[in-house]
Design a protein with these regions (language model features):
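Polytopic transmembrane helical bundles with strong interfacial aromatic enrichment
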Residues: 2-345
């Protein structure tokens, strides 16, 4: 059948496609973790060539030692994500009837290709590490967001949610969630800039306060306005849990870095001494050991999961709630705020 504005509507969602999208999202989380371990262990320069590794696609066990383990594992998992994303895009292109979803899947594939190329450039131009590593991190998180979106768009709950209800009270939830997504993305960039030596701790720490306030406001507003709607409150509750964990991990990572042997550490420079915005990388200093590595890697992963959760809440808010202009029109026209609106597929 045809949906609003002539959009083709498939009444039966493809469960296999949905679960495969979730699988690709899971692989991406593993890839993000592998990348975090590469950064924390200063392993990015351990393999000097790209796309090959020591001139080979598969390295020998003799080479799979020390920091090479982290960098090569990162590349191997990235290859798996690339193949899986290609399969997902191909599957969606031939089975998904919504053109915009097909194009989004294609964008995901192009994104993972671009990410691989930027990673290769980073290997061949180590002197420009901060300049290249920060967009590399941003594209990684953005790619993850696109995959999560594809999983949402192919879910049963997305298809079942056909009526839009009013969003009474305060700033529209659509606006709040969109603002939260943007804030989290900016904060992830600031975190990447700090980890890769492109800036000091001050922007990331200040951003953490602002982002925490915005995301908490969004989650609490959702729980207050839509307490009986599981479609919205489930991601909102999870968001509060992740936000608490993220702040806790951030504080613990800060304290662990301050007390690490060899502080200040390589790859980030004397940030805590100067609180400067200028990159002051000290490549000859000692990389911190546990628990510093685990805390920073966990902080990155929980940040990615926070982005995914707020993105899910945002998409669901756009799916389930009327936009502000519809609410205003109903009030000015004497209509009732209880009247539903059909959601486009």
């Amino acid at each position: 059948m045809k949906g609003q504005k002539g959009i083709e509507v498939t009444e039966r969602p493809n469960a296999g496609l949905h679960w495969f999208a979730i699988f690709v999202a899971f692989l991406t989380v593993v890839l993000l973790l592998a990348g975090a371990l590469v950064t924390s262990n200063e392993a990015g320069d351990s393999v000097p060539d790209w796309p090959l590794s020591f001139g080979r696609w598969l390295i020998s066990s003799d080479n799979f030692i020390a920091n090479v383990r982290y960098e090569y594992s990162h590349r191997f998992i990235a290859g798996m994500v690339g193949v899986a994303t290609f399969a997902l895009a191909l599957w969606m292109w031939f089975s998904e009837r919504r053109a915009w979803v097909r194009w989004l899947a294609l964008i995901a594939f192009l994104g993972v290709v671009l990410q691989a190329v930027i990673g290769g450039v980073r290997v061949h131009f180590p002197a420009y590490k901060p300049l290249i590593a920060v967009p590399h991190a941003l594209i990684a998180q953005s790619f993850f967001g696109v995959i999560v979106s594809l999983a949402v768009f192919t879910s049963k709950s997305w298809w079942r949610q056909r009526d839009r209800k009013p969003d009474a009270g305060g700033l529209p939830l659509r606006t709040l969630t969109t603002l939260s997504v943007a804030a989290v993305l900016v904060q992830l960039v600031l975190g990447a800039a700090f980890r890769h030596g492109a800036s000091g701790i001050t922007p990331h720490a200040a951003g953490a306060v602002i982002v925490t306030a915005i995301v908490a406001w969004t989650a609490i507003a959702t729980l207050r306005r839509h307490s009986g709607d599981a479609y919205l409150i489930r991601p909102a509750k999870l968001l509060l849990v992740l936000l608490t964990a993220q702040v806790s991990l951030g504080v613990m990572a800060y304290l662990a870095r301050m007390s690490s042997a060899g502080y200040p550490v390589s790859g980030v420079g004397e940030f805590f001494d100067s609180m400067s915005l200028a990159p002051l990388a000290q490549p000859n200093q000692v990389q911190p050991l546990e628990p510093m590595i685990s805390l920073t890697a966990g902080h990155l992963i929980v940040g990615a999961l926070t982005l995914a959760t707020i993105l899910v809440l945002t998409l669901r808010a756009y799916r389930a709630l009327q936009p502000g202009r519809e609410r205003a029109a109903e009030v000015s026209g004497g209509g009732t705020l209880a009247s539903p609106r059909k959601a486009a597929i």
